[in-house]
Curated annotation (Swiss-Prot):
Its EC number is 1.1.1.-. Binds 2 Zn(2+) ions per subunit. Pathway: Carbohydrate metabolism; erythritol degradation; Carbohydrate metabolism; L-threitol degradation. Catalyzes the NAD-dependent reversible oxidation of erythritol and L-threitol. Involved in the degradation pathways of erythritol and L-threitol, that allow M.smegmatis to grow on these compounds as the sole carbon source. This is Erythritol/L-threitol dehydrogenase. GO terms for biological process: carbohydrate catabolic process; carbohydrate utilization; cellular response to carbohydrate stimulus. Belongs to the zinc-containing alcohol dehydrogenase family. Induction: Up-regulated during growth on erythritol, D-threitol or L-threitol relative to growth on glycerol. Keywords: Carbohydrate metabolism, Metal-binding, NAD, Oxidoreductase, Zinc. InterPro entries: ADH-like_C, ADH-like_N, GroES-like_sf, NAD(P)-bd_dom_sf, PKS_ER, Zn_alcohol_dh. Its cofactor is Zn(2+).
Amino acid sequence: MSNQVPEKMQAVVCHGPHDYRLEEVAVPQRKPGEALIRVEAVGICASDLKCYHGAAKFWGDENRPAWAETMVIPGHEFVGRVVELDDEAAQRWGIAVGDRVVSEQIVPCWECLFCKRGQYHMCQPHDLYGFKRRTPGAMASYMVYPAEALVHKVSPDIPAQHAAFAEPLSCSLHAVERAQITFEDTVVVAGCGPIGLGMIAGAKAKSPMRVIALDMAPDKLKLAEKCGADLTINIAEQDAEKIIKDLTGGYGADVYIEGTGHTSAVPQGLNLLRKLGRYVEYGVFGSDVTVDWSIISDDKELDVLGAHLGPYCWPAAIKMIESGALPMDEICTHQFPLTEFQKGLDLVASGKESVKVSLIPA
């Protein structure tokens, strides 16, 4: 390694649920075809929080094995500067030392059924940064982009926390793509957190009849308007189902995109949709959800679609951020040094004062 790169660095290390520690670890060594990156910013995602709190999706239960691994550095939404790379990596990704770059959150194997079909976001091994030992994340001063990674350049002229928002925004845009929105649609987005705000912006870009945002926080509903919502509904104070059905001649919404991960948002969406409507689920749930499946089948014949990660949406997400189309200063509300990672996790968990919380490694 060059003289500019230290031998040791600070990093957050996952030892298991409720046991994340700030430690001094060795700076990772890149292999041929890889790039060493100095991390500039890493966002704290709801998935990070649910992993921290021990959700079965990550740590398993009687119905599924554990997916997350211990002794891993968390962090899958990030941006950094290229510190070291070889000619192979430079030519593959079109990058050079000093460039600001992001990497898509999954590092595909490129050998499985899904990768060979171009569905790399569903790669069978499913190595996401920050959850697997093969792919350590960005809650550290340095990280490595493996040779199999998907890498994109980002403008050096925007704040680092804005650039790191490309990851959640790509996810939002993929969920919008799954909805197959048309010009006459009434689109409802549940949740005005980081994912929901991106969904609102993406849905608005599809030029539907109207985009409606649901949340319980007045400040977030105001932010939703700045992201493109034509109507906002505070579900703690207003009857969303009645309002939406009154707007649509009694039919209901054409599209419902769920981005909260709250169990109550699922039956809410099923009830808000018209017959033959489209439900897109992006939320990551901390517990099981029970619904009346007859609404999906016999009552309404709904299309229920999942959405995962942000395949093929990263260039659009980066362009949207760089263009100033989103109120990024109001979305990226809090930044903390790496030493205060626990404060960041706790702030995200409170769900009240923040929208997007980021860590800024020294």
